[in-house]
Swiss-Prot record:
The keyword Ribosomal protein applies. GO terms for cellular component: ribonucleoprotein complex; ribosome. Pfam families: Ribosomal_S25. The keyword Ribonucleoprotein applies. Belongs to the eukaryotic ribosomal protein eS25 family. Keywords: Ribonucleoprotein, Ribosomal protein. This is Small ribosomal subunit protein eS25. Residues 1-32 are annotated as: Disordered. Residues 19-28 have a biased composition (Basic residues). InterPro entries: Ribosomal_eS25, WH-like_DNA-bd_sf. Transmembrane segments: none annotated.
């Protein structure tokens, strides 16, 4: 079999120039988040809400509290430490970055009655 007839240099250049040109990437304008105006100190209303509503949450982290109560994360973390000291919530997991808390579940009256005779 004879070798195929090759393209000339000129034909190769034309083929390279006309085809397979990539379009330049258009950078989309990123959607910027609005700057948060979270409070950096507890006021009476927010502190009362922290003490009444937060112990009812199933999963409690500083970032969740910050989002829901519109306070700074550092203030939320300090508030959660205080609630933990007062035994209103329980620490589940602790790392250098964040702490995870949960509510304290009260034992049902039937379970408490059954546990009392066993202790005697």
């Amino acid at each position: 079999m004879p070798p195929k007839a090759g393209q000339t240099k000129k034909a190769k250049m034309e083929a390279a120039n006309k085809g397979a040109k990539k379009t330049t990437k258009k950078w989309s304008k990123g959607q910027s988040r609005e700057a948060l105006q979270n409070a950096v100190m507890f006021d009476k209303e927010t502190y009362d809400k922290l003490r009444s509503e937060v112990p009812k949450y199933k999963l409690i982290t500083p970032s969740i509290i910050s989002d829901r109560l519109k306070i700074a994360v550092s203030i939320a973390a300090a508030g959660l430490k205080q609630l933990c000291r007062e035994k209103l919530i329980r620490l589940v997991s602790c790392s250098s970055k964040t702490r995870v808390y949960t509510r304290i579940v009260q034992a049902a009256p039937a379970e408490a009655a059954a546990a009392a005779p066993a202790a005697e």
